[in-house]
């Protein structure tokens, strides 16, 4: 199975601080990998590098077979739009746009706008009945599903989710996890960043960070499913 991404000896230095120190691991296509660690372990710095919001001080980041370690500004933007879907704990929705328009705005940045594709994306996350609703008219779980639809509209190679259920109650957390499990079955590559050990167990493997170092990588033989929450 091919790699969706691979990190080779990644380091990130801020002044005298090594936020990431010699991080190496790979994520196979269609795999769900959970990245875990306590506060200050380097998770946020790693997400910034994986999502091309920042560059490593040293090391190589291979994304879909391409070296994404030191791209110029134009190529970085192109890679981010075409290869990566991002879901955050905060929703970052445009408050005065409808659910449909919030999905379509991601298409504008991709130079291809198709309302039917946006509708299908919302249908896939169970929001076909909320097309004209604004974010303030949606529940927290619905807003996060809208964010997932937006992140998937351009068919990225990998979905990076940073604490995606951090602001949700248990019922909505189950809905989001069920959706991620469905996406994995469809072959989508998922990288979930979380401090919650229970959520980490839904992945095919867990990458543990501590003090900026790779502490352990554990393969999960039988990943959890949402009805076990």
Predicted regions, residues:
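Conserved beta-strand-loop-alpha-helix hinge in the C-terminal portion
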Residues: 205, 213-229
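ABC family nucleotide-binding domain
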Residues: 2-205
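A cytosolic small-molecule/anion-sensing beta-strand core signal
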Residues: 210
